Amino acid sequence: EDDREQGWKDLQEHSIGIEDTVIGIAASGGTPYVVGALERCNDAGALTGCITCNPGSPVTRVAKHAIVAVVGPEYVTGSTRMKSGTAQKLILNMISTAVMIKLGRVKGNRMVDMQLSNNKLIDRGTRMVMERLGIAYEVANELLRKHGSVRKALESRS
């Protein structure tokens, strides 16, 4: 967290460039790891943003786009996992949801490209296929298992 170069080193395996967007997250807005990484991402031509809870902090000056959630002081001083962390997570959820919609991974209000990694998600996917196609649960489940994804199951009947 204190090493200004380590953030960029950690990003090297992703070959950051002009096609990328990098969002730095720092409750205080001054974390050297985040600030340094964003500076180097700017140099590489990436679009940069930040999410912080401290207006006018170093990270807001480095990022091309800043989101500042002014939540006030933490109830327990220094415990940024409380208000700051919660606010930042909500913002990240909004950003990731918007990205998934823009990428076409949502049909209507359903995430059709979800990973079917457990029984609960398989059931959810089956119900999506069932409702969208107007077929019985068992038929939808068979389609889902055959095609391996909600999107492919839906497209198989389009």
Model-derived regions: residue spans:
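Glycine-rich phosphate-binding loops that contact phosphosugars or nucleotide phosphates
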Residues: 1-90, 99-103
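Short, amphipathic alpha-helical interaction segments embedded in low-complexity terminal/linker regions
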Residues: 99-158
